[in-house]
Design a protein with these regions (language model features):
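Acyl-donor-binding surface of acyltransferase catalytic domains
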Residues: 1-30
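Acidic/histidine-enriched, glycine/proline-rich intrinsically disordered or flexible terminal extensions
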Residues: 1-4, 163-185
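A conserved beta-strand-loop-helix scaffold within acyl/acetyltransferase catalytic domains
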Residues: 54-61, 67-106
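Conserved glycine-rich acetyl-CoA-binding loop
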Residues: 105-119, 128, 140-144, 151
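Conserved GNAT acetyl-CoA-binding A-motif
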Residues: 125-137
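Conserved acetyl-CoA-binding loop of GNAT-fold acetyltransferases
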Residues: 126, 148-159
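Conserved beta-strand-loop-alpha-helix junction that forms the acyl-donor binding cleft
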Residues: 135-145, 162-168
Length: 185
């Protein structure tokens, strides 16, 4: 089993852009992804390092339905034509937008690309008629994630403990994924 503390955050008014670097060779773009392409990017952004596993264990048809839903938008940061970030905005709840998945690959960590991506995310979310932009993160994620979301204008609203079968033991993720989290056989 693997346990994590999940923190839920929300933003109820648009936050202003925060300073982001001008990154040569990095371009924000829509992401057109089939299930395999999406899972590859999902793994590079979150599954390998941070134990993101929900979409890795989801049935292909269920994931395809989400990816093809007109109320779900996907975006990325392209570096030399290769997707190196994942931004998934979910507008399926009336009046709200969930920042469903957000992150950059190790190739962009520490470059300021996350700030650039968040500025785009916030603008895109609030272009729609919403009153709430929300996200959740957990203690399995990058140690700077919670602080980053707070600096981006999100406010914590609650926490929960989640316990799930360890995806490294069920075969969903490789044994070397999430090396910061011990495996308890």
């Amino acid at each position: 089993m693997v346990a994590t503390v999940v923190t839920y955050l929300e933003m109820t008014t648009p936050a202003p852009d925060r300073p982001a670097p001008d990154l040569d060779g990095i371009r924000f773009a829509p992401l057109e992804a089939d299930v395999a392409t999406y899972r590859d990017l999902f793994a590079r952004v979150g599954a390998q390092d941070w134990l993101w596993f929900s979409r890795m264990q989801m049935a292909d048809d269920d994931l395809a339905a989400i990816l093809n839903d007109p109320d779900v938008t996907l975006h990325t940061l392209l570096k030399d034509g290769t997707p190196e970030a994942l931004l998934e905005l979910d507008f399926r709840e009336d009046g709200a937008c969930e920042l469903a998945f957000f992150g950059v690959t190790p190739a962009l960590l520490g470059t300021g690309a996350g700030r650039l991506l968040m500025n785009h995310a916030t603008r895109l979310a609030w272009q729609r008629l919403i009153t709430r932009f929300h996200v959740h993160t957990c203690t399995l994620d990058h140690p700077g994630a919670l602080g980053f979301y707070r600096r981006s204008g999100f406010t914590p609203i609650r926490q929960e403990v989640e316990i799930a079968p360890d995806p490294r033991l069920t075969g969903v993720l490789p044994k070397d994924a999430g090396s910061h989290v011990p495996i308890f056989p």
